[in-house]
Regions:
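Bacterial N-terminal signal peptides that target proteins for export
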Residues: 2-10
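Terminal accessory carbohydrate-recognition/targeting modules of carbohydrate-active enzymes
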Residues: 21-218, 222, 226-228
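Bacterial N-terminal signal peptides
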Residues: 9-17
């Protein structure tokens, strides 16, 4: 029942992402872009060096980082669980995107930026360029918006899921569960072809209409107890 409610919530957020912005929202967004890169939160998760900051918003218990240019991943890194008792990268990246015709092709970073309330990144391969934006829509969910300069099919997958995490596919959502009770959901629109592959997933978007919207959520099963 809980996951059914979460899927309904994520679909609602995806629909909101597709809808046009109001004039007030547009004004706020324009102001946001006057404060580019006031923080450097570039970090690709590994065991060699520490992370010193995450992008988080709306009172969320999860955070994301921009990938480092020298260790590029074509997706925002995370989510990272900010649980005060058990901090962990739930994935190096829960949603990595590529062109479906050549998923092994290397993407070259063009631009990354932290804005107040938004992460931005763009990269290119020989097949075209892909831009991505990430904004929190609530304490538990962030909306990922993807655009490309070509109508070629896109393919999503996860990169390096965290220790002890089990991945499954339920309807239009990817469910990544940790034994602690923390669960990551990656929710796609109904037209996406979603499949489970080993302990991971693939999501194929055919002839995409941009922007492509994906909801990333981190649910804490014990959250009411922690916050009481």
């Amino acid at each position: 029942m809980k996951y059914k409610f979460i899927r309904i919530l994520c679909f609602t957020l995806l629909a909101a992402g597709i809808a046009a912005c109001t004039p007030g929202m547009k004004s706020t967004t324009e102001k946001r872009y006057t404060f580019a890169d006031i923080l450097d939160i570039s970090y690709t998760p590994d065991t060699l060096h520490r992370c010193y900051g995450w992008f988080t918003d709306a009172g969320s218990w999860m955070g994301f980082t921009l990938p480092e240019r020298q260790q590029w991943v074509n997706g925002f890194c995370g989510p990272f669980s900010l649980d005060m008792f058990r901090r962990q990268w739930m994935a190096q990246s829960a949603a990595v995107v590529s062109f479906a015709k050549d998923t092994q092709e290397i993407f070259v970073p063009d631009s990354t930026c932290y804005y107040p309330g938004e992460l931005y990144m763009s990269a290119h391969s020989t097949h075209g360029s892909i831009t991505q934006r990430l904004n929190f829509t609530s304490a538990s969910t962030a909306l990922l918006r993807i655009e490309a300069d070509t109508a070629e099919d896109l393919l999503f997958s996860g990169s390096q899921w965290g220790k002890d995490i089990t991945v499954s596919v339920e309807q239009n959502s990817v469910i990544a569960r940790h034994p602690s009770g923390e669960t990551v959901t990656v929710t796609f629109t109904p037209n996406v072809e979603l499949a489970k592959t080993d302990n991971n997933y693939t999501a194929l978007v055919r002839s995409p209409r941009y922007p492509v919207n994906v909801a990333l959520s981190l649910i804490h099963i014990s959250e009411p107890t922690r916050r009481s």
